[in-house]
Each structure stands twice: as structure tokens, then as C-alpha cells.
């Protein structure tokens, strides 16, 4: 899809919004990284205060995908830091959305990747590799499934069951 704002996507797709095929995430995310606008097919990971699975995905080629991490909204530690974000950038991920905290904000803000997270926190997560991958996640009341499409800009984040064109 050529760049069209999320607001324009919503305006042009009212029927998809009414049917639930196009959903907007609640405006709870902070914007990090140099790429403020990003989109791509979704890969989901569900973890809690552990980033082992996140790191496994980031080591793969991203091919323009968006990693959606449901960290349970925890604000007790950061489940993503600068090194993995640099690796995600280098491996071709379009963006990462974290329902939780990140750290190394200055380093992340220098990366050419889009990152959304609830906040920053200096304490790092464990690395046990606990969690689930490629499962439906629920972030602030919005269900997101592996393989859906995510569109993010400075107005917000949209999730669609199908790839959109306006």
C-alpha cells in the first residue's frame, strides 16, 4: 500500500470497521525509532517479563513483517532493548509493537525501524524463553492474530484481517 495515513484508511474503510475486520488499537503506545510509519504482516508472541522468544524471532529475516509482542502490559521490566532492535532493523523487520516496556531508548531512537511500547524501564527481563508464539493476543481489548496486517503512523495503530489498499 502506498503511504496513506491511518486516518485516511479509516475514512475509506468504514464498512471494515463496522464489521470488525479493521480495528484501531487504543492510543496507549509511545513512539520510538526513526521509522514513525510502518506496516506489514503480523507475527505474534505472548510473553511475560521474559524476552527469550522475542529474541528468537528477531534473529529471523523479517521480510517487512511486524512483530507484535503481548507482554501482558507489564511495567515492571523491559522486554525489549537496544541490541535486539538493532538486530531486527538489520534483519528487515518493519516494526515491533510491545504491550509492555522497552529500554535503551536513545539507541532505539537511532534505529531505522518503527517501535511502539507502553513506556521505558531500566530493568531487563529474564531470558528463559517462556511464552507462546503465533497465537492470538489481546492488547488493550483488541484481538490480534498472527498473519493479520498492521499499519502504524503518528495517528495510531490499525490491525486488519486483510491487506488494505485505498
UniProtKB/Swiss-Prot annotation:
Known InterPro entries for this protein? RraA, RraA/RraA-like, RraA/RraA-like_sf
| Reaction catalyzed | 4-hydroxy-4-methyl-2-oxoglutarate = 2 pyruvate; oxaloacetate + H(+) = pyruvate + CO2
- Per its UniProt record, what CDD domains does this chain match? RraA_family (cd16841)
What does UniProt give as the signal peptide span? Answer: none
Which residues does this entry mark as bearing N-acetylalanine? 2
What does this protein's record comment on cofactor binding?
Divalent metal cation.
Q: Which residues bind substrate?
A: 81-84, 103
Q: A Gene Ontology molecular-function term?
A: ribonuclease inhibitor activity
Entry's EC annotation: 4.1.3.17, 4.1.1.112
Can you cite an annotated GO cellular component? plastid
- Cofactors per UniProt? a divalent metal cation
Which Gene Ontology BP terms does the record give?
regulation of RNA metabolic process
Q: Which UniProt keywords apply?
A: Acetylation, Lyase, Metal-binding
Assembly and partners are described as: Homotrimer.
Q: What does this protein do?
A: Catalyzes the aldol cleavage of 4-hydroxy-4-methyl-2-oxoglutarate (HMG) into 2 molecules of pyruvate. Also contains a secondary oxaloacetate (OAA) decarboxylase activity due to the common pyruvate enolate transition state formed following C-C bond cleavage in the retro-aldol and decarboxylation reactions.
Family to which the UniProt record says this protein belongs: Belongs to the class II aldolase/RraA-like family.
| Protein name from the UniProt record | Putative 4-hydroxy-4-methyl-2-oxoglutarate aldolase 2
Q: What is the protein's species of origin? A: Arabidopsis thaliana (Mouse-ear cress)
Amino acid at each position: 500500500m502506498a503511504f496513506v495515513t491511518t486516518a485516511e484508511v479509516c475514512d475509506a474503510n468504514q464498512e471494515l470497521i463496522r464489521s470488525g475486520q479493521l480495528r484501531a488499537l487504543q492510543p496507549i503506545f509511545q513512539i520510538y525509532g526513526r521509522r514513525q510509519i510502518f506496516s506489514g504482516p503480523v507475527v505474534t508472541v505472548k510473553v511475560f517479563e521474559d524476552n527469550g522468544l522475542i529474541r528468537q524471532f528477531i534473529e529471523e529475516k523479517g521480510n517487512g513483517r511486524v512483530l507484535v509482542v503481548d507482554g501482558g502490559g507489564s511495567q515492571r521490566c523491559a522486554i525489549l532493548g537496544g541490541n535486539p532492535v538493532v538486530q531486527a532493523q538489520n534483519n528487515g523487520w518493519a516494526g515491533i509493537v510491545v504491550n509492555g516496556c522497552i529500554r535503551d531508548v536513545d539507541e532505539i531512537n537511532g534505529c531505522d525501524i518503527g517501535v511502539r511500547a507502553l513506556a521505558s524501564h531500566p530493568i531487563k527481563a529474564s531470558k528463559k524463553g517462556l511464552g507462546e508464539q503465533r497465537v492470538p493476543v489481546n492488547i488493550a481489548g483488541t484481538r490480534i492474530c498472527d498473519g493479520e496486517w498492521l499499519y502504524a503512523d503518528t495517528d495510531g495503530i490499525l490491525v486488519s484481517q486483510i491487506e488494505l489498499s485505498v
